[in-house]
A protein has these predicted regions:
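Transmembrane beta-barrel domains of outer membrane proteins
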Residues: 44-48, 81-85, 93, 114-118, ...
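Residues that define the transmembrane beta-barrel architecture of outer-membrane proteins
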Residues: 37-41, 45, 74-80, 107-111, ...
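Detector for outer-membrane/organellar transmembrane beta-barrel domains
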Residues: 91-92, 107-179
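Short glycine/proline- and aromatic-enriched beta-strand/turn motifs that initiate or cap beta-hairpins
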Residues: 19-69, 77
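Outer-membrane beta-barrel "beta-signal"
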Residues: 194, 198-200, 224-238
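Transmembrane beta-strands of outer-membrane beta-barrel pores
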Residues: 30-36, 59-65, 86, 98-104, ...
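Cleavable N-terminal export/targeting peptides
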Residues: 1-25
Length: 238
């Protein structure tokens, strides 16, 4: 976690400097997963610059969910993300980026590329491919020590309903590269997230989120449980 603390300090220094960035965004979110009976808390700071760069840092904390040796997940983590927007024209944008994830298990790197299209001033579509590579090894289904690497595809739809409300949908497909399985007993899993934001002021935006996480719930040694996530949060421009 030492690397995470160093990167966190660098990002916070950048966010706090008026010479580098105009204003950061703080996002505070809590959630509950029905299948795993798990509570989560997330704190996220992000900022975009006029030259095309964007960066974020977030910390996720979970309560002690269960004891399941089949699940290769850590309960607490920190991640740092950076990307760069390349404008192809007035409607199309390509964003190559990198997500670095730190947990008690080790470090995971997620290089990605995202393509977005502004269909109208209120409607945006996007697709993204990300490859999650783990710098550490874990026991696979054959008993060998390998890397639980994942191919990930995301689709995005964002619609500004009016000046007060914004709706977003994100659909995700995960596919494990090596001999591992998700809690649904498959090499692949899906997620769908639906978010509704309410813009109280230009600087304060509360939101609600519902996610269906396939049959990835794990509780008291049982897996392949239907998993629903209910979240509520608020973002502040600092």
């Amino acid at each position: 976690m030492k690397k995470a603390k160093i990167l966190s300090g660098v990002l916070l220094l950048c966010f706090s400097s008026p010479l580098i960035s105009k204003a950061a965004t703080l996002d505070v979110r809590g959630g509950y997963r029905s299948g795993s009976h798990a509570y989560e808390t997330r704190l996220k700071v992000s900022e975009g610059w006029q030259n095309g760069w964007w960066a974020s840092m977030e910390s996720n904390t979970w309560n002690t969910i269960h004891d399941n040796k089949k699940e290769n997940a850590a309960l607490n983590d920190v991640q740092v993300e950076v990307n760069y927007a390349i404008k192809l024209d007035d409607q199309w944008t390509v964003r190559p980026g990198m997500l670095t994830h730190f947990s008690s298990n080790g470090t995971r790197y997620g290089p990605y590329v995202k393509l977005s299209w502004d269909a109208t001033k209120d409607l945006n579509f996007g697709i993204r491919y990300r490859y999650d590579w783990k710098a550490y090894r874990q026991q696979d289904l054959s008993g060998d020590m390998s890397r639980d690497n994942v191919h990930r595809w995301d689709g995005y739809v964002t619609y500004h309903i009016n000046s007060d409300f914004t709706f977003a949908w994100q659909t995700t497909l995960y596919s494990k590269q090596n001999d591992y399985r998700y809690a649904n007993h498959k090499k692949w899993a899906t997620e769908n997230a639906f978010v509704l934001q309410y813009h109280i002021t230009p600087d304060i935006t509360p939101y609600i989120e519902y996610d269906y996480l396939d049959r990835q719930g794990v509780y008291n040694g049982r897996d392949n449980l239907s998993e629903n996530s209910y979240r509520i949060g608020v973002s502040f421009k600092l």
